[in-house]
């Protein structure tokens, strides 16, 4: 039978186990990213979707972020700018809460991505919004 192939650049996985509905064909899992979104930073493949997965689990953040890749000397650096939620600015102890969020994000990014990243918390509504696909990566490296 014919096999139709498309080069979508979607990253997913094949699931060989039968479906609960009884079908026995190989299934495709959820799309976890796109190969054309991949960044290579110090030899590590980093996808914006990985960063987003870490950010979703942190209270007090908005779903708006920007990745800035730069080169200092011979090393690539990754800076992650994340918008804070306005809810954080409604009570006391804001500075301590912000410091805790920043430290936790740095640790989580290291654990999940395998590289150290610079984490910068930015004020609400400072990261550009776009109508179409969000442009989340700024690559300043001269390759």
Give a label for each model feature:
Residues 1-143:
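Active-site glycine/GP-rich loop and adjacent strand/helix microenvironment
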